[in-house]
């Protein structure tokens, strides 16, 4: 880009950083830093949570992947990638059930109580890998609008963007993340409409709707595979699950449902940028559909696309850092029964900074952004039955470990030696292996969880032991609802400990 254009692009990145710092609260309580509460200890507004989930899941890498799928498979590819957003309502329903029926207050504490410390460390390791992936995969997308991969402008833009995000997260924590997410969601929606106003009129709606072929080889294999991953994908995303415990259960479920449906629509709409490239026969080799299409429409369209990527990457990255702080400063010390002498906020900030540095190493090395989604999605297939079937059969530590590691091993093998699992392929399309491994892998993971539970359940029945693992009855839930309503009316729901400021 020439000097004038460069000033425009770099200037926006700096202005973006200033605005985010101004929006993020400078002084928050511990409850605000780790749970998103306001200064009075009240949970975040459900509509703020909806906006936060919506934009935090519109990752820079995800909209890029959606457009690339549209460029490769037409509208079939766009719908396929949008399938992932349907896991948000499913995850919301599962968390609603766990909170209501089993009194879960968080993923880590829930696993500790029902599956033991070993299960928690397996789960936490998967979350940390996911959070690590989110750093480099999003900063690399932003860097691509400032220079070629690996170039000095590419790396500088990505690192500056990371520094901006870490900076305002250190001030506001999860509360700051949720507040800035609202602004980023509005910015994304406005610019998406503007970009589509350039792209959509170039073809008829019929052309968009009929692009691609509805066959396994035409991308339907990816649609089915993504649908299977929806059964487990949301549970290893700390950004999503953390927001499942910060407001009342029914409000949370509504927020998750609305955010998931809005996200599905937004991803399909964004994929039309790639579908435009598909219809025009544009080559995206060595680049990405958003970059190629935006460049073909002129510098203003290219700039607007860059702003979209910055907004979406920022929302994901700040949510990633706030969830990382909660996991490392609150959740993991809690399960170990250890209370750190250092201020938990400081611990969280230290991990944010370390992850901000280490998490960018793959970006500098030029890793492929698609791997952050497809590999992790395959590896964590075993989480689906653990959270969806809890209480349907007796929960067992053996069942957790079998389900978790069957999925993890299949995912690792599929990454390092996919040919070894070629016998699982379904169809002959580009995603034949993806579909086969996820279908047969899901069957194996669910069986691995169910069988030990059924065996333990049968043993209890023979011994005449009354099951205590089925959770609260309907009568118990009705009594709790009545008590919660009384407490709300009397203003007894605030936690005085959460009102203590963090001193920043």
Predicted segment positions?
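Selective recognition of specific alpha-helical transmembrane segments in multi-pass small-molecule
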Residues: 11-12, 125-136, 187-197, 222-234, ...
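Hydrophobic, small-residue-rich membrane helices and short re-entrant helix-turn-helix hairpins
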Residues: 103-112, 173-181, 236-265, 282-291, ...
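Membrane-interface "cap" regions at the ends of multi-pass membrane proteins
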Residues: 1-63, 169-175, 185, 191, ...
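Hydrophobic alpha-helical segments and their helix-loop junctions in multi-pass secondary transporters
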Residues: 17-27, 131, 135, 139, ...
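Membrane-interface helix-loop-helix modules in multi-pass membrane proteins
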Residues: 35-104, 228, 240, 245-282, ...
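Helix-loop-helix module between adjacent transmembrane segments
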Residues: 20, 78-170, 229, 309-319, ...
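Terminal cytosolic tails of multi-pass membrane transporters
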Residues: 25-30, 39, 421-504
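Loop-to-transmembrane helix boundary motifs in multi-pass membrane proteins
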Residues: 114-121, 326-371
């Amino acid at each position: 880009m020439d000097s004038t254009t460069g000033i425009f692009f770099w200037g926006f990145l700096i202005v973006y950083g200033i605005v985010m710092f101004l929006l993020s609260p400078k002084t928050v309580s511990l409850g605000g830093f780790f749970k998103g509460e306001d200064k009075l200890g009240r949970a975040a507004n459900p509509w703020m949570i909806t906006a936060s989930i919506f934009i935090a899941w519109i990752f820079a890498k995800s909209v890029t992947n959606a457009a690339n799928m549209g460029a490769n498979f037409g509208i079939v590819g766009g719908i396929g990638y949008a399938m992932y957003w349907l896991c948000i309502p499913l995850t919301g329903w599962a968390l609603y059930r766990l909170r209501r029926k089993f009194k879960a207050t968080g993923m880590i504490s829930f696993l500790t109580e029902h599956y033991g410390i070993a299960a928690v460390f397996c789960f936490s390791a998967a979350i940390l890998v996911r959070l690590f992936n989110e750093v480099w995969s999003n900063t690399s997308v932003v860097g691509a609008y400032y220079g070629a991969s690996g170039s000095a402008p590419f790396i500088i833009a990505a690192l500056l963007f990371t520094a901006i995000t870490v900076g305002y997260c250190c001030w506001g924590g999860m509360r700051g993340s949720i507040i800035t997410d609202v602004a980023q969601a509005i910015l994304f929606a406005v610019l998406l409409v503007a970009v589509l106003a350039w792209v959509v009129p170039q073809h008829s709606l019929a052309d968009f709707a009929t692009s691609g072929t509805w066959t396994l080889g035409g991308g339907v294999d990816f649609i089915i595979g993504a649908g299977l991953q929806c059964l487990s994908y949301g549970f290893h995303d700390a950004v999503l699950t953390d927001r499942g415990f910060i407001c009342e259960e029914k409000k949370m479920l509504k927020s998750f449902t609305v955010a998931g449906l809005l996200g599905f629509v937004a991803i399909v709409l964004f994929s039309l940028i790639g579908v435009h490239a598909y219809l025009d026969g544009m080559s995206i080799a060595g680049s990405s559909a958003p970059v190629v299409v935006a460049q073909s429409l002129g510098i203003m369209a290219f700039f607007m696309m860059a702003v979209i990527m910055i907004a979406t990457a920022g929302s994901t990255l700040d949510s990633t850092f706030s969830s990382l702080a909660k996991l490392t400063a609150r959740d993991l010390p809690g399960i170990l029964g250890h209370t750190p002498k250092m201020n938990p906020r400081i611990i969280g900030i230290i991990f944010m900074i370390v992850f901000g540095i280490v998490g960018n190493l793959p970006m500098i090395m030029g890793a492929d952004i698609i791997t952050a989604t497809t590999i992790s999605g395959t590896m964590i297939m075993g989480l689906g039955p653990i959270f969806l079937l809890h209480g349907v059969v007796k929960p067992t530590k053996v069942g957790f470990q079998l389900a978790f590691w069957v999925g993890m091993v299949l995912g690792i093998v599929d990454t390092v030696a996919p040919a070894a699992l070629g016998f699982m392929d379904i169809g002959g399309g580009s995603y034949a292996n993806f579909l086969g491994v996820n279908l047969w892998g899901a069957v194996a993971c669910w069986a691995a969880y169910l069988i030990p539970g059924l065996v333990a359940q049968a043993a209890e029945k023979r011994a005449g032991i009354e099951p205590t693992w089925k959770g609260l009855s309907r009568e118990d839930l009705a009594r709790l609802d009545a008590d919660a309503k009384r407490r709300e009316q009397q203003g007894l729901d605030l936690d005085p400990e959460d009102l203590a400021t963090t001193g920043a």
